[in-house]
Every structure is written in structure tokens, then in C-alpha cells.
């Protein structure tokens, strides 16, 4: 196997997040044969992917002559790289995800990855931060299992004085996501970097940049 959760067969690569997406979208059992044919892989490869998902904490029911079925519990959400990737349908943003159960700061991590040459669109996500920061260096309380902490690294082709617009772009993205689960009239954006629900802050955004006078090396925009 190429790496845990991904197997090569006939030039195709099947990742466990793809299996997870297939099971989650299904209304009933999905047969092993259907998974084999859909991804062009062997039954052994499918079995290994299922076992990897179970190791990650997913409950998957298997029945002879029926296949596999994902047992989901809304009160026990699994927060992992696999879970995040299974929802991704973007072309560039978030196609390279770095996930930490615990880290100091996702912004610091994203800047380090940018310096190492990671591609634009790299997304750093953490379940807990021990050195989270807000604007003007203010501390940011970031316990595990309570919130979302993420930083997106981009290499935009624009002048440095335009980079601050990415803070608003992130705020709009968070706002639109929140509006999918909260009545739109309750949500808002408080300039320049907060998202609010019922006039209470639910998200702060911090944008940092490495640049020269005429060009940007990279920008990291963190949201928590």
C-alpha cells in the first residue's frame, strides 16, 4: 500500500475518505462488489479501508450478501483528517490537509509549512491549541472538543496591500457556513474579523503575511 488508507490498483488510488463518503451518502448497505467495481480495486483493498475507518472510530456494520453500512451517531461526531477530507469537493482549497489533535497554533504551523514549500490551499486543522492568538497578540482559549481551529495558507497573485481582503473572504465563508444551521437573520459579520450570532462572537479571524514590497510569498488566514 502507498500509505495508510490508500491502495494502488490499475493506476487508481482509493482512499478511506472516499469509502466513508460512499457509505455516508448511501441509504442502505453498499455491497463489497459495488465498492470494488466503483473504485476498480480488490475486495482486500476495500476490507482494509473499512478496517482503517473502524480504527478511526467509525462504526460500520457488515452483513453477508448485503455489504457495509455506516452507523452514524449525531452525538458522537468524529473529528479527524479523514472526516474532513470526506466532505471536500474543492479543486485547490483544502486538498492538502494537515490535522493535529493538539498543536500550539495553526497559524504558526501553516507559516512553517509555507516556508517548506507546501502548495497554496494547504489547510491546517486542530482539535486543540495551546498557544492560540487573536489580533494584537491577544491570547485565544482553545480547548479540545469544543470548537474548530483552522488556518488556510494561500499564495495569492496580488499586491500586498490587497491581502487584507482575505480576512473578509474568510469571514464571509464562515458566515455562509453558519447560516446553513442557524437562521440567517441571527448571523452577522462584525468588521473587521468577527462572525457573530445573536450579537455574540462565535468566530475570530487572524490574517498574517510574508511579503516583499511588490509581491506576496504567502498569506495565512486563521479562523477559530
List each language-model region with its residue ranges:
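C-terminal regulatory/effector modules of DNA-binding transcriptional regulators
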Residues: 3, 11, 125, 137-138, ...
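N-terminal lobe of the biotin/lipoate ligase/transferase fold
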Residues: 15-179
Amino acid at each position: 500500500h502507498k500509505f495508510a488508507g490508500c491502495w494502488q490498483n490499475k493506476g487508481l488510488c482509493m482512499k478511506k475518505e472516499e469509502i466513508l463518503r460512499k457509505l455516508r451518502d448511501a441509504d442502505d448497505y453498499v455491497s463489497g462488489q459495488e465498492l470494488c467495481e466503483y473504485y476498480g480495486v480488490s475486495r482486500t483493498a476495500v476490507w482494509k479501508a473499512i478496517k482503517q475507518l473502524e480504527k478511526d472510530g467509525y462504526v460500520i456494520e457488515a452483513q453477508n450478501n448485503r455489504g457495509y453500512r455506516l452507523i452514524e451517531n449525531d452525538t458522537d461526531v468524529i473529528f479527524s483528517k479523514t472526516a474532513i477530507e470526506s466532505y471536500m469537493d474543492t479543486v485547490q482549497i483544502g486538498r492538502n490537509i494537515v490535522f493535529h489533535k493538539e498543536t500550539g497554533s495553526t497559524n504558526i504551523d501553516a507559516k512553517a509549512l509555507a516556508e517548506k514549500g507546501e502548495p497554496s490551499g494547504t489547510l491546517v486543522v486542530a482539535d486543540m491549541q495551546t498557544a492560540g492568538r487573536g489580533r494584537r497578540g491577544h491570547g485565544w482559549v482553545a480547548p479540545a472538543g469544543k470548537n474548530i481551529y483552522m488556518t488556510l495558507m494561500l499564495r495569492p497573485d496580488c499586491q500586498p496591500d490587497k491581502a487584507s481582503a482575505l480576512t473578509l473572504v474568510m469571514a464571509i465563508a464562515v458566515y455562509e457556513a453558519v447560516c446553513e444551521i442557524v437562521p440567517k437573520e441571527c448571523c452577522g459579520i462584525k468588521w473587521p474579523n468577527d462572525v457573530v450570532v445573536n450579537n455574540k462572537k462565535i468566530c475570530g479571524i487572524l490574517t498574517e503575511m510574508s511579503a516583499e514590497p511588490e509581491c506576496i510569498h504567502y498569506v495565512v488566514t486563521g479562523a477559530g
